[in-house]
């Protein structure tokens, strides 16, 4: 096992060096480009890379991030895949209507991304889900199982055993009674200290994490009125665990190829949540990395290599 990890790390390092050597010769299709689309009257920002006739890979971000979290992953995949990374409403560079103007629920986020993909002409695709990306992505998968070619879950939970004590500490009381006292507790999750903790806790070398990551996310959280958006989604998250059984049924019946690559030191989603995918799909690939919640920040090259190997075996 140690030898396997050594060779995987060496391959990831070589892959990173190879990317650097061709940076100046990068083709237009491999370059990440930046766009907006009008979806149901909202401006949806998205990043795009790779040939449009290549297999599609849709990257679905978590909280409190945006497509910014995929900025280094996309060029590592775009020679072989058409990669799309949208920002949800209320996140990143997409529009942020008030909760009175847009219902901030995971059903509605999935509706918006579904309509975005229809508009882009994306009929078949693989999904990469992280954190909030999981309830969005699994809604898409259960609505349109014929469209999903593969699932990559990076700390994107779909099992009760994946929920760490964090959920009981901050959210269960709020779900039961969203009064001002319980709301104030949840509001602590919108501070810079909390955002930094998500990025740095469980990392081997926190000094390798660029402060651009958590400061970019925090700037979004501190926009006027954004706290109301996030509180609405925190409250709606209570509707996700009751859907887990239907997601498991989808995995058992439709059998999409699954790659679970998780930071095993995540304070929010436990490794047991990654291991549980093997229960519903014994063929699923599992890789537990010695890092945290935002695993791309520390192990992006290795994750890219695992994705390339996984999709190369499963997508034709």
What is the role of each PLM region?
Residues 59-62, 85:
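Structural cue for short, hydrophobic secondary-structure segments
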Residues 62-65, 131:
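Active-site glycine-rich loops that stabilize anionic/oxyanionic intermediates
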Residues 64, 89-92, 158, 292-295:
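Alpha/beta-hydrolase active-site loop signature
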């Amino acid at each position: 096992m140690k030898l396997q990890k050594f060779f995987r790390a060496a391959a990831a390092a070589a892959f990173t060096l190879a990317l650097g050597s061709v940076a100046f010769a990068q083709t237009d299709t491999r370059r990440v480009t930046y766009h907006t689309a009008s979806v149901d009257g909202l401006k949806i920002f998205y990043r795009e890379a790779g040939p449009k006739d290549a297999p599609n890979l849709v990257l679905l971000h978590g909280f409190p991030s945006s497509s910014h979290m995929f900025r280094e992953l996309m060029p590592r995949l775009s020679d072989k895949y058409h990669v799309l990374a949208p920002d949800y409403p209320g996140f990143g560079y997409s529009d942020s209507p008030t909760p009175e103007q847009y219902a901030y629920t995971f059903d509605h986020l999935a509706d918006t991304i579904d309509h975005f993909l229809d508009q882009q002409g994306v009929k078949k695709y693989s999904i990469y889900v992280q954190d909030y990306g999981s309830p969005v992505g699994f809604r898409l998968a259960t609505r349109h199982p014929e469209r999903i070619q593969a699932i990559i879950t990076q700390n994107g939970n779909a099992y009760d055993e994946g929920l760490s004590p964090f959920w009981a500490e901050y959210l269960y009381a709020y779900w039961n009674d969203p009064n001002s006292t319980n709301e104030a507790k949840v509001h602590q999750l919108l501070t810079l200290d909390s955002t930094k903790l998500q990025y740095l806790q469980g990392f081997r070398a926190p000094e390798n994490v660029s402060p651009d990551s958590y400061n970019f996310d925090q700037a979004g959280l501190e926009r006027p009125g954004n706290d109301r958006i996030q509180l609405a989604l925190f409250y709606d998250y209570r509707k996700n665990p009751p859907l887990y059984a239907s997601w498991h049924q989808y995995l058992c019946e439709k059998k999409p190829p699954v790659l679970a690559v998780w930071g095993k030191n995540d304070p929010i989603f436990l490794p047991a949540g990654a291991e549980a995918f093997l229960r519903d799909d014994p063929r699923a690939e599992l890789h537990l990395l010695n890092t945290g919640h935002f695993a791309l920040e520390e192990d992006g090259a290795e994750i890219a290599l695992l994705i390339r190997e996984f999709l190369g075996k499963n997508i034709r």
